[in-house]
Structure formats: structure tokens, C-alpha cells
């Protein structure tokens, strides 16, 4: 069957997005073809995303020079969380528990992929340390995330900054029998009195 070229073009564009395969892309394209108001709203949102760029201070997404978090005077500027990505920053923000500032590295150390310290936003991090009392290394619990945290801990301690790592353990609502050994071990190491 021959489809209109504009529908094919939209389907191809949608299928290049992460998590969207060809069938989902086609369903979305067909939906938009029959729901013009939603298509218009999406087009407007896509036009607006062109204004988004990296915050010059932390690497978060911003529509101006600084992101809303860096502009927020109520944030604790003595506390800095280092994350691998903007998605990680958003995950911490959703918790509502962290009131400091962030620094986005733009990845994790991965020598096999050619990602060393020079490929990450480390110089920006080191420039931001004035007035910072504690850096929380909130990198992933992967080999790369752990390597990045160890490297940064060494570098930051040389600069006289207190370095911490989030406690890792069991998820709320999770069953012990399904937890892996490493998670259980970390949960037991980080136990606290009740």
C-alpha cells in the first residue's frame, strides 16, 4: 500500500526517537493525521524546544543562560549533586529531598568507548567548587558510574571538599527474595537504627 509522503516522513522521524519502534511510530503518525489539534500542539511544542539549551552553570536544560534550579536563590549552594545526565537530575528532583544544586557530567567514564575525563564536564565542576562544602556523587550503580565516582572522589578530596554517595538499598515495596546480592549487601552496609 502506498502512503502519503508526509505520513511516511513523520513515521520515519518518530521511529528515530528512543523507545519508539516502526509500528508505534506508524500508530502515532496516523493518530496525528486524524487529530489536527493534537498535531498542531505537538508542532508548537517541537518549535519551542529549539530554544532549549544547556545551562552554562550546571549543564541542565534551560531556555536562557541559566536553568530554573541555578536561578533559585532558595537552593543550598553549599551542596552539589553530580549526575551523569539530565534524566538523572530530574529523577533526583522528583524525590523532592535534594535542595542543593546540580552538575551534569554528560556521561560516565568508559575507556572502552573512548570516554575519559576530558570527555566529561569535569573542568566546569572543578570551577564551581568555591563555597561548596559537600559534593554528592549521584552516579549510576554501573561499572562506569562506580569508576566515575571513584575518580571524582579522589579529585574532589584533593581539593578539600567533603564527598558523599547516596545510600543504596532496597526499593520501597520491594520483596527481599527478589533483590540481588549486591543490593542486599549495600542495604545492610547502610542500615540505620529505628
UniProtKB/Swiss-Prot annotation:
Record-linked PROSITE patterns: RECR, TOPRIM
Pfam families: RecR_C (PF21175), RecR_HhH (PF21176), RecR_ZnF (PF02132), Toprim_4 (PF13662)
Protein role: May play a role in DNA repair. It seems to be involved in an RecBC-independent recombinational process of DNA repair. It may act with RecF and RecO.
Record keyword Flavoprotein present: no
Organism taxonomic ancestry: Bacteria, Thermotogati, Deinococcota, Deinococci, Thermales
Protein family: Belongs to the RecR family.
GO biological process terms, semicolon-separated: DNA recombination; DNA repair
The name this protein goes by in its record: Recombination protein RecR
GO MF term list: DNA binding; zinc ion binding
Keywords, ordered alphabetically: DNA damage, DNA recombination, DNA repair, Metal-binding, Zinc, Zinc-finger
Top-level taxon of the source organism: Bacteria
Domain Toprim: 78-171
InterPro entries named among the record's database cross-references: DNA_Rcmb_RecR (IPR000093), Hlx-hairpin-Hlx_DNA-bd_motif (IPR003583), Rcmb_RecR (IPR023627), Rcmb_RecR_Znf (IPR015967), TOPRIM_dom (IPR006171), TOPRIM_RecR (IPR034137)
Amino acid at each position: 500500500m502506498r502512503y502519503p509522503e508526509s505520513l511516511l516522513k513523520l513515521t520515519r522521524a518518530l521511529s528515530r526517537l528512543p523507545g519508539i519502534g516502526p509500528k508505534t511510530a506508524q500508530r502515532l503518525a496516523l493518530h496525528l493525521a486524524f487529530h489536527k489539534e493534537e498535531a498542531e500542539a505537538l508542532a508548537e511544542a517541537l518549535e519551542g524546544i529549539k530554544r532549549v539549551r544547556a545551562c552554562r552553570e550546571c549543564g541542565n536544560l534551560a531556555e536562557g543562560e541559566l536553568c530554573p534550579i541555578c536561578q533559585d536563590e532558595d537552593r543550598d549552594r553549599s551542596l552539589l549533586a553530580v549526575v551523569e545526565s539530565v534524566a538523572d537530575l530530574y529523577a533526583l528532583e522528583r524525590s523532592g529531598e535534594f535542595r542543593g544544586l546540580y552538575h551534569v557530567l554528560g556521561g560516565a567514564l568508559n575507556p572502552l568507548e573512548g570516554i575519559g575525563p576530558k570527555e566529561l564536564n569535569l573542568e566546569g565542576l572543578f570551577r564551581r567548587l568555591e563555597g561548596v562544602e559537600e559534593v554528592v556523587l549521584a552516579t549510576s550503580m554501573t561499572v562506569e558510574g562506580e569508576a566515575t565516582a571513584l575518580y571524582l572522589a579522589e579529585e574532589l578530596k584533593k581539593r578539600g571538599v567533603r564527598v558523599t554517595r547516596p545510600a543504596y538499598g532496597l526499593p520501597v515495596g520491594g520483596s527481599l527474595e527478589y533483590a540481588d546480592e549486591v543490593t542486599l549487601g549495600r542495604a545492610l552496609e547502610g542500615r540505620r537504627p529505628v
